[in-house]
């Protein structure tokens, strides 16, 4: 936890992706594809190096665009007043049912330990987490939220807007799939779950969690502002599960991606029968859509 967060900057990860391309002996690739946290990373690859990444496919997490530079705040007192405005995160905590945003929880010192050494065991934690965010959990029926307010955010499931006094392992334990549901699952086989359990048992989750801390810290903000107003102009596409709240968790991002961030958006697909893990829950359809997109580039 107590580590330098600068390696987790978005543009440093782009540099890693660029290094990988060159390590394989190429100077460009047909496309870059990213899911979840990899979706904005793929987008930033496309923004910063369109000469290398000729197209982009984003999955689950819409890219709302490059940041805008502050303007119109010459009046110092006005800026100070804006900085004192109430926080939606604070508002969540004082709802009738007190809540907290999962990304804020992931920034806490205890988050890694809570999940890594979950009371129910690591394997059961991962299984419950995957189930809770999948289409197998029938209450995943996402829709557009009216805005970025505590009241609207609180409409999302607890894996995104957690109960204030619970950690993530406790949160998903309440939605552990039954033996029947586990037996019917075709997209998270035991051998795959075993790999996840072994590897996360070895490494823990802190590396990934540091990405959330970096984002909230403001580290790297100045360097990405170099690309303020820049759009993704190469061919792009977006895929998400029809039951994935990730599409709508940041109100307005799904629309901004299509209307402003990407000027050559070729297709948007919300795949039925899939939640957050679209590439696993509906692997055949996801592969078909990606191949169709890639075939259309030539």
Can you annotate each of these PLM segments?
Residues 1-33, 40-266:
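Flexible "cap/lid" subdomain of the alpha/beta-hydrolase fold that forms the substrate-access gate
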Residues 263-298:
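Catalytic active-site module of serine/aspartate enzymes centered on a nucleophile-bearing elbow/loop
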């Amino acid at each position: 936890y107590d580590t330098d967060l600068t390696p987790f900057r978005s543009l440093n990860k782009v540099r890693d992706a660029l290094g990988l391309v060159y390590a394989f002996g190429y100077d460009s690739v047909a496309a870059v594809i990213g899911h979840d946290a990899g979706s904005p990373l793929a987008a930033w690859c496309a923004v910063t190096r369109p000469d290398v990444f000729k197209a982009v496919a984003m999955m689950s997490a819409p890219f709302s665009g490059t940041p805008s530079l502050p303007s119109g705040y010459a009046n110092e007192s006005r800026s100070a007043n804006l900085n004192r405005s109430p926080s939606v995160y604070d508002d969540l905590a004082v709802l009738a049912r007190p809540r907290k945003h999962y990304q804020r929880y992931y920034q806490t010192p205890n988050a890694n330990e809570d999940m890594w050494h979950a009371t129910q065991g690591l394997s059961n934690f991962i299984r419950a987490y995957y189930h809770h965010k999948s289409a197998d959990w029938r209450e995943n029926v996402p829709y557009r939220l009216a805005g970025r307010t505590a009241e609207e955010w609180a409409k999302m499931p607890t894996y995104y807007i957690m109960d204030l006094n619970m950690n993530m392992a406790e949160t998903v334990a309440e939605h552990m799939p039954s033996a029947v549901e586990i037996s019917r699952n075709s997209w998270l086989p035991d051998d795959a779950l075993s790999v996840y359990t072994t590897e996360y048992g070895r490494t823990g989750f802190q590396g990934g969690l540091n990405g959330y801390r970096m984002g909230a810290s403001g580290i790297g903000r100045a360097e990405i502002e170099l690309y303020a107003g820049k759009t993704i102009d190469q061919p792009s596409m977006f895929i998400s599960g029809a039951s994935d709240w990730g599409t709508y968790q940041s109100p307005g991002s799904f629309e901004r991606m299509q209307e402003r961030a990407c000027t050559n958006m070729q297709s948007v697909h919300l795949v039925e029968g899939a939640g957050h893990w679209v590439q696993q829950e509906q692997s055949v359809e996801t592969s078909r859509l990606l191949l169709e997109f890639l075939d259309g580039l030539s």
